[in-house]
């Protein structure tokens, strides 16, 4: 577990440098603790692994004010555990379910038990995301997702994929994306 914690800390350190997030920004976390253990997703969930991962994420949350959203497994349609305040702030519809390790996944179940005022919502548009073990978090990211590359690519046996998001660039060839080089010309 010590080696996994060190891997996790290294991943989060690099991710935070490349995706500077602050108060109110939402980070979605999808995690198969089974995959961390080297087992097939959904077969060997571990509350101990979930606790280790959660501790580092919670420290990041307390330091920066980010909001965490923990994706449940497919048995709960990949719904998300968030704090009630996050649901209110983002206008998210709360659904009635309590995640457990066998229906929701160990990570979401653990987060539900550790949050101050947890609720479950069906969807969110997160500013960034962490996918541990191919849990498919893309449905919960804002467009446009941008991959974040880090030097440590695994926690235990689980592949880790990271993403941040950026606003869409709209407008075509004459569009301006910075006031430093305005295209003020009206000629065609």
From Swiss-Prot:
Q: Which domain of life is it from?
A: Bacteria
What's the protein name?
A: UPF0340 protein GK3370
Which InterPro entries does the entry mention? Antibiotic_NAT-like (IPR028345), DUF436 (IPR006340)
What species is given as this protein's source? Answer: Geobacillus kaustophilus (strain HTA426)
Q: Where do the TM regions start and end? A: none
Similarity remark: Belongs to the UPF0340 family.
């Amino acid at each position: 577990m010590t080696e996994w914690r060190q891997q996790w800390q290294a991943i989060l350190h690099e991710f935070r440098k490349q995706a500077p997030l602050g108060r109110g920004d939402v980070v979605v976390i999808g995690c198969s603790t089974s995959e961390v253990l080297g087992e097939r997703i959904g077969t060997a969930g571990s509350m101990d692994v979930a606790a280790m991962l959660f501790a580092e994420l919670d420290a990041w949350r307390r330091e920066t004010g980010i909001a965490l959203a923990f994706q449940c497994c497919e048995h709960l349609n990949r719904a998300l555990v968030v704090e009630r305040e996050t649901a209110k702030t983002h206008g998210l519809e709360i659904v009635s379910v309590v995640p457990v390790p066998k229906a929701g996944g160990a990570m979401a179940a653990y987060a539900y038990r550790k949050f101050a005022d947890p609720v479950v919502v069906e969807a969110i548009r997160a500013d960034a995301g962490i996918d541990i073990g191919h849990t498919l978090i893309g449905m919960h990211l804002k467009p446009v997702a941008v991959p974040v590359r880090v030097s440590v690519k695994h926690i235990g046996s689980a592949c880790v994929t990271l993403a941040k998001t950026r606003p869409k660039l709209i407008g075509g060839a004459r569009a301006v994306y910075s006031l430093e080089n305005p295209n003020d010309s009206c000629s065609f």
